[in-house]
Amino acid sequence: MLEPNVEFWKRVYAEFGMGDFVLHDRENLLIIYEVVRVSEATNERRAADLAKSEIQRLREQYEDILTALAQGKSPEELGPEGQRVAELWGCPCEPDLLRRAAGNVRVQQGLREKWDEGVQRARGLMPRIVSILRQHNVPVELAALPMVESTFNPRARSKAGAVGLWQFIRSTARSYLSVSRKRDDRHDPLRSTQAAARLLKHNYEALGSWPLAIVAYNHGKAGVQTARERVGSDAIEDIIVRYNGPRFGFASKNFYPEFLAALELLHPTIRQHAGQENSRKGS
């Protein structure tokens, strides 16, 4: 059920660059309407500036096509683009589905360059991260999570104030790390990995599964508990598809698929370092 989402994020990480803007459906990530390519972009912000007007034009175009289809117009009346959109959705479709789709056209910028930079940073950090995760008896596969959070950048800072490799916000970090004006251990790759391992293990013990523990790392343990109760299921697929809490938006719904995508791409590197550690222990 999550495979289309995972495949979408693998393409965002490994195929689409900063000059690529993917117009897609917010809920069904199999539906990609178009990829706008800005070849002359020299950096991420420049690419966004160059593509802004074209993206807005295309977004409105697809919204208009979907609305027209929902109102009963035939694909043929809407020309080649209308026919292509109808084929993407496998129409004839229910009007409600098409009206919903008209409000769900989203744009995702490619991340290939950021991913490549993250891979370079990960090479120096991965052996120590794997070792720390093992010390805390948590899955070494969690070593893929910093790629989703920060592309392995210890100096990363989000708009929400999350900091470091593992993107701790101040309130959460204070339970595990030293955070003050003089010293902020969120920037320390090793100390923050120790803290992340403890937090993830705590989430796992409270929620009973690693998929839920990983989502809780983004959405909070209480938020995941609420989602589980509302949906009436422990299955991560059910929660992602069926839960529509006010704070459980696109980013939260896709956090676990993004992790799985990063894990698939990074798995050989993680297993390599895990194997090297096993060899050292056995020697």
What residue ranges belong to the model's regions?
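A generic alpha-helix surface/boundary motif
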Residues: 126-128, 146, 167, 171, ...
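Short, small-residue-rich loop/turn micro-motifs
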Residues: 149, 169-173, 221
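Short, surface-exposed glycine/acidic/tryptophan-bearing loops
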Residues: 100, 156-177, 233
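Carboxylate/His-rich catalytic cores and anion/metal-binding grooves
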Residues: 130, 134-168
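Short, well-ordered helical secondary-structure segments
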Residues: 3, 45, 49, 76, ...
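A general marker of short, structured functional hotspots
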Residues: 9, 17, 29, 58, ...
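Extracytoplasmic and endomembrane cell-envelope/extracellular-matrix remodeling and assembly machinery
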Residues: 80-124, 135-136, 175, 179-183, ...
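An acidic, Gly/Ser/Thr/Pro-rich helix-cap/linker signature
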Residues: 1-136
